[in-house]
Curated annotation (Swiss-Prot):
<keyword id="KW-0131">Cell cycle</keyword>
<dbReference type="GO" id="GO:0005694">
    <property type="term" value="C:chromosome"/>
</dbReference>
<keyword id="KW-0132">Cell division</keyword>
<dbReference type="GO" id="GO:0007283">
    <property type="term" value="P:spermatogenesis"/>
</dbReference>
<dbReference type="GO" id="GO:0000801">
    <property type="term" value="C:central element"/>
</dbReference>
<protein>
    <recommendedName>
        <fullName>Synaptonemal complex central element protein 3</fullName>
    </recommendedName>
</protein>
<dbReference type="InterPro" id="IPR028145">
    <property type="entry name" value="Synaptonemal_3"/>
</dbReference>
<dbReference type="GO" id="GO:0051301">
    <property type="term" value="P:cell division"/>
</dbReference>
<dbReference type="GO" id="GO:0005634">
    <property type="term" value="C:nucleus"/>
</dbReference>
<dbReference type="GO" id="GO:0035234">
    <property type="term" value="P:ectopic germ cell programmed cell death"/>
</dbReference>
<dbReference type="GO" id="GO:0005654">
    <property type="term" value="C:nucleoplasm"/>
</dbReference>
<feature type="coiled-coil region">
    <location>
        <begin position="8"/>
        <end position="75"/>
    </location>
</feature>
<dbReference type="GO" id="GO:0006915">
    <property type="term" value="P:apoptotic process"/>
</dbReference>
<dbReference type="Pfam" id="PF15191">
    <property type="entry name" value="Synaptonemal_3"/>
</dbReference>
<comment type="function">
    <text>Major component of the transverse central element of synaptonemal complexes (SCS), formed between homologous chromosomes during meiotic prophase. Required for the assembly of the central element of the synaptonemal complex during meiosis, via remodeling of SYCP1 lattice structures and promoting recruitment of SYCE2-TEX12 and SYCE1-SIX60S1 complexes. Required for chromosome loading of the central element-specific SCS proteins, and for initiating synapsis between homologous chromosomes. Chromosome loading appears to require SYCP1. Required for fertility and normal testis development.</text>
</comment>
<keyword id="KW-0469">Meiosis</keyword>
<dbReference type="GO" id="GO:0007130">
    <property type="term" value="P:synaptonemal complex assembly"/>
</dbReference>
């Protein structure tokens, strides 16, 4: 059985390269769409916060409460681990 000629291999390589390029471009387009959606939501959030200043303050208080709660939970978790190690 004879090997395929160099022109045919070159053509097959070109088709594979074009197919790979097409897949890469599709992935890039999908990523750009995701970034575009994120930017749109960021712009929307900025408009909402500027038109409703109390929302920004509420978000800050909520974040502070969350961080305080998280800190307390971590402290309690460390205490529990310390007690468990002492008992063993």
């Amino acid at each position: 059985m004879a090997d395929s000629d160099p022109g045919e291999r070159s053509y097959d390589n070109m088709l594979k390269m074009l197919s790979d390029l097409n897949k890469d471009l599709e992935k890039l387009l999908e990523e750009m769409e995701k970034i575009s959606v994120q930017a749109t939501w960021m712009a929307y959030d900025m408009v909402v916060m500027r038109t409703n200043p109390t929302l920004a303050e509420s978000m800050r208080r909520l974040e502070d409460a969350f961080l305080n709660c998280k800190e307390e939970m971590e402290k309690n978790w460390q205490e529990l681990l310390t007690e468990t190690k002492r008992k063993q």
